[in-house]
Structure formats: structure tokens, C-alpha cells
């Protein structure tokens, strides 16, 4: 259960989603999760770890991208799965500890 969430994704876009409720009273948190995780398992894991009640969970499979390695060699980045956890505006998760 605890190993489903790998790490939080802290980017400019995820910070904007987390700090500014967009007209609605909801907060969005983005996590990198295991490939075999599903929505119900993620909701239960977030509930147990952070003691909050998620309203929704959205899952995105991020595909690998082409990258130039050394000289003329090409490679790919790894694919991963990320989850967007939706919370009520009254609840929050302290990600940066």
C-alpha cells in the first residue's frame, strides 16, 4: 500500500494546481505512481498515508520521449504513470517536508 506512491511531482504546473483553487474549492496533487496501480488502490493509499479523503483520482500514462544521448546516438526516456489526486479545498497534504 505504501509503495504505490513513488514520489510527488513538483513542477510549475503542479504547484499551480496545488496552491490555487480554480473557481472550485478543490486542490490537486500530482504523484508519480507504480505502473500496476489503479484508482481505487491509490485512493485508499492516500487516505491511509496522509489522513485525507480524496474526492477523485485521475491517472495518466506518460509515454517515453526521444532524447539525444552522446554524439549521434538516440535514446528514450522511461515511461511512467502519474496520478492527480483531487481533494476538497479544506483538506491539504504537506508534500514538502
Curated annotation (Swiss-Prot):
Keyword Secreted carried by entry: no
Keyword check for Lyase: no
Keyword tags: Ribonucleoprotein, Ribosomal protein, RNA-binding, rRNA-binding
Cellular-component GO terms for this entry: ribonucleoprotein complex; ribosome
SUPFAM superfamilies referenced in this protein's UniProt entry, alphabetically: Ribosomal proteins S24e, L23 and L15e (SSF54189)
InterPro entries: Nucleotide-bd_a/b_plait_sf, Ribosomal_uL23-like, Ribosomal_uL23/eL15/eS24_sf
Subunit structure: Part of the 50S ribosomal subunit. Contacts protein L29, and trigger factor when it is bound to the ribosome.
Protein family per UniProt: Belongs to the universal ribosomal protein uL23 family.
NCBIfam families linked: PRK05738.2-4 (NF004363)
The name this protein goes by in its record: Large ribosomal subunit protein uL23
Gene name of the record: rplW
Amino acid at each position: 500500500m505504501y509503495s504505490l506512491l513513488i514520489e510527488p511531482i513538483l513542477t510549475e504546473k503542479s504547484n499551480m494546481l496545488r496552491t490555487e483553487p480554480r473557481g472550485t474549492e478543490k486542490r490537486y496533487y500530482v504523484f508519480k505512481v507504480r505502473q500496476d496501480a489503479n484508482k481505487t488502490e491509490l485512493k485508499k493509499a492516500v487516505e491511509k498515508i496522509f489522513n485525507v479523503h480524496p474526492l477523485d483520482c485521475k491517472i495518466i500514462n506518460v509515454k517515453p520521449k526521444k532524447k539525444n544521448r552522446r554524439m549521434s546516438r538516440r535514446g528514450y526516456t522511461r515511461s511512467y504513470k502519474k496520478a492527480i489526486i483531487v481533494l476538497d479545498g479544506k483538506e491539504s497534504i504537506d508534500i514538502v517536508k
